[in-house]
Amino acid sequence: MKRAGIKAQVGYRGPRARKGEASIVTPNRLQRQFNPDSPDKRWVTDITYIRTREGWLYLAVVVDLFSRKVIGWSIQPRMTKEIVLNVLLMAVWRRNPQKQVLVHSDQGSQYTSYKWQSFLKSHVLEGSMSRRGNCHDNAVAESFFQLLKRERIKKRIYGTRDETRSDIFDYIEMFYNSKRRHGSSEQMPPAEYENLYYQRLRSV
């Protein structure tokens, strides 16, 4: 290519992921069953990256598949095991599930770690993982990140990490969970859809 005078096109690159061998891989128990009939039956989780002028930030979320509500989220400057544990702890603390919940992720090293698997067992959660390289197995989590980047980030580069955290908080807690309507939830925002479910349950 060099001799022919051809230059390779270099695309936009995200942060480099650390390579690590999978230690514990669980079966794909979710099997793309994205529409449970009640809250706290199936959760999905994933990580994405956000660019700032102070460096990269990593956003991890946990989404309840019933309502598409973000029930846990964490932003950290490094993609470590702690970020996924923190976000799952937030989800457990907020929801306090009374029955076993299926928690689905990809096969990233954070999720195949002993710490992740140990946390699941100690909190009566059942693990599930996408097939390697198959993003469609975790389509709802991927869809949330696409919405976030299309509706709020819009290809911008945040000035500071603090600004980023504040804006992501606003999007998730003040807009997405409480105002954004979803076709999968009768065109209601996640919080309203869950409230309606519990109202109907009490009236039975």
Give the ranges of each region predicted by the language model.
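Charged DNA-binding/catalytic regions of mobile-element recombinases
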Residues: 1-204
